[in-house]
């Protein structure tokens, strides 16, 4: 599973969003058609779970029953494309979400109310990412988050919305549309917090810290750095076990004293056992830290 898919699947397991989220989804992945002299709405995605999420969203909000269709792509990836197809109540949905002007090319940016309200902005960013967002796998060491828009003014409004949350968002125009993007790891982690993907934010940060620790090892050129590398190397097994726990039962399932040690070990892979002991809110002995780390390793081994 790609990191992008992981983020999106975390988002759809949160409580159902509001009209601002749905407006962003439809604006970025929806299209209008005309059949039997009435409008129909098609919303496309390559993720079956997202298709079911959109289906339920529309069904609950408008008491209408859409249809889910799919077809196979003919390119090398051969992914299925799922379409949430709405035949009834399309005019009501467009009016309620203030999208009619957008589809007819009259107003392709973001509603001023969304840009001025933080809660509306968070919901809109969540919907935009679900519809047209991607994150480069943090394991690559090259950090990039992108959201694709058909219209440049929408991409620029997205950047403005992100900048409201102190993110260094930029836009670039392509022949087929425009992209709003983030390139700093800290901005991407903050974006994940803004849209509610807390678990993926923790995973992203853990991977980033591990990469930085490995890079520190590779740059070890003197005795002092070599000692740090030795400490980091010794802590890798525990850090990997902590990540395993985060990905399965969640760090919050551990007793608080184990959570504190685990968080410190991931945040500071270069810390010696004594430094971990000293950094705790209520300092304990080295043997106490070792005892807790052994408990963490055993929990991970038993998973």
UniProtKB/Swiss-Prot annotation:
Ordered alphabetically, the record's keywords are: Cell cycle, Cell division, DNA-binding
What's a single GO BP term from this record? regulation of sporulation
Give each disulfide bond as a residue pair. none
Q: Which InterPro entries match?
A: Homing_endonucl, Sporu_reg_WhiA_N_dom, Sporulation_regulator_WhiA, Sporulation_regulator_WhiA_C, WhiA_LAGLIDADG_dom
The entry lists its GO molecular-function terms as:
DNA binding
Feature: DNA-binding region: 272-303
UniProt entry tagged with the keyword Transmembrane helix? no
- Gene3D superfamilies in the record: Homing endonucleases
Please state which protein family the record places this protein in. Answer: Belongs to the WhiA family.
The task this protein performs is described as: Involved in cell division and chromosome segregation.
State the name under which the record lists this protein: Probable cell division protein WhiA
Q: Which organism is it from?
A: Streptococcus pyogenes serotype M3 (strain ATCC BAA-595 / MGAS315)
Task: Give the source lineage, highest ranks first.
Answer: Bacteria, Bacillati, Bacillota, Bacilli, Lactobacillales
């Amino acid at each position: 599973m790609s990191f992008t898919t992981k983020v999106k699947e975390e988002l759809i397991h949160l409580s159902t969003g509001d009209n601002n989220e749905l407006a962003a989804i439809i604006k970025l992945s929806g299209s209008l058609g005309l059949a039997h002299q009435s409008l129909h709405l098609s919303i496309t995605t390559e993720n079956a779970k997202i298709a079911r999420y959109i289906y339920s969203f529309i069904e609950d909000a408008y008491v209408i029953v859409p249809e889910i269709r799919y077809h196979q792509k003919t390119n090398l990836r051969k992914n299925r494309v799922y379409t949430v197809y709405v035949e009834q109540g399309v005019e009501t949905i467009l009016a309620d979400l203030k999208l009619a002007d957008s589809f007819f090319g009259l107003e392709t940016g973001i509603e001023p109310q969304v840009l001025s309200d933080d809660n509306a902005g968070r919901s809109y960013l969540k919907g935009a990412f679900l519809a047209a967002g991607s994150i480069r796998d943090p394991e690559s060491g090259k950090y990039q988050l992108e959201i694709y828009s058909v219209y440049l003014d929408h991409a620029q409004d997205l950047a403005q919305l992100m900048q409201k949350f102190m993110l260094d968002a930029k836009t670039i125009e392509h022949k087929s549309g425009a992209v709003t993007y983030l390139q700093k790891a800290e901005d991407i982690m903050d974006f994940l917090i803004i849209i509610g993907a807390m678990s993926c934010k923790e995973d992203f940060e853990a991977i980033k810290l591990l990469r930085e620790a490995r890079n520190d090892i590779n740059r070890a050129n003197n005795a002092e750095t070599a000692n740090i590398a030795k400490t980091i190397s010794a802590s890798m097994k525990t850090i990997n076990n902590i990540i395993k726990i985060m990905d399965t039962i969640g760090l919050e399932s551990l007793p608080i004293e184990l959570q504190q040690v685990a968080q410190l070990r991931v945040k500071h892979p270069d810390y010696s056992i004594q430094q971990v002991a000293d950094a705790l809110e209520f300092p304990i002995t080295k043997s106490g830290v070792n005892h807790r780390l052994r408990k963490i390793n055993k929990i991970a081994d038993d998973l």
